[in-house]
Amino acid sequence: VTKPATKPTKSATAVKVRAGNTRVTGKEQYYTPAPLAAKLVAEVAALVGNFESRTVIEPAGGTGSFVEAAERAGAARVLSVDIEPKHERVNLGDFLEVELPAHNAITISNPPFGRNNSLSIPFFNRAAEVSEYIAFIVPRSWRKWSVQNRLDQNFHLVRDDDLTINYVDVNGQDAHAKNRLRTCVQYWERKSKLRPIVKVKDMGIIERTTPELADAAM
């Protein structure tokens, strides 16, 4: 079963990113430390099997930590783009707009989050078009049904681990201490059965009304 096509999303460069957490600075140029990238790639390889025959996609390549880790782990092919690449194996491009010559790939990334996940969710849904597995470092708000309801329904969450990252700068040095962000790494798998949308029953506790009839204002 394939979910109907979703409406087009804005490009990564077109989405206005507002400061919402300590990771968001301009174009969110904090990078995943290489040892952490290697650890997560190893986890993915163990989870999916046949890693040596797989194509790996890194949609926010940056300094190439995931690219190098995937290559060392033996991936058959690694494709990566970034709007401001900092590594020779990362191509210049907007992931939300570039063509992806892959099928049943594995997408591994620490994508840009954006305010209220305005970037991370479009990145996931774009990756879902060509992937069998997706492993993303994301805010822990991704555990909420309100976020997961916006993700491609063909994908099912198979693992979710807490993660606290000390981000690094373009030179691999520790970035500002305030950038520590409570995140998680989620592993998603494409399945033929659609994931159900979570619906919350309206208990009628709060109702929209006019100012004249309201009991309280928020």
Q: What do the PLM-derived regions correspond to, one by one?
A:
Residues 1-218:
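Class I S-adenosyl-L-methionine-dependent methyltransferase catalytic core
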